[in-house]
Amino acid sequence: MAAQFDAVDRAILAELARNARLPNNALAAAVGIAPSTCLTRVRALQAAGVITGFRTEVSMRAIDRPLQAMISVGLSADVRADIRDYARRFIRYPQVLDVYYLAGRDDFLVNVAVRDTDELRDFVTDYLSADPGVARTETSIVFEHLRDLRLFPDPDAGPPVF
């Protein structure tokens, strides 16, 4: 069952989603509560497993990995029993940012960041396609990644207008 949040918890989570480095005093001011109350709330959200960590977003371009791709991976039927082992194996490759375990035609969606198309090709052919348990791959290059950090969409907002 999903945790129930009051308006203050929602506001805290929304602010931290936008800026996880926000000092407690600034967070408290942003949500309109006392700093001591804010700290207690954040610690309670951590203890409940709602806040699982604070992460740094790194510019892939700045570390010479500007090209991202999403690679759909389908495993052969004879390795399905080892499907979780494949996920753990994939995530260990230095090019891999995320591994998504899927329902549907493909078993995984692997998000990679590489220097260029040569490195992408080599990764797919030398690591994924060369694995006897991998039946198929399909690679899509990411042109742009947009992210909406609203955790609790306004139910009265209706569909977006373009």
Go through each PLM region and give its residues:
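A compositional/biophysical signature of low hydrophobicity enriched in polar/charged and small residues
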Residues: 1-162
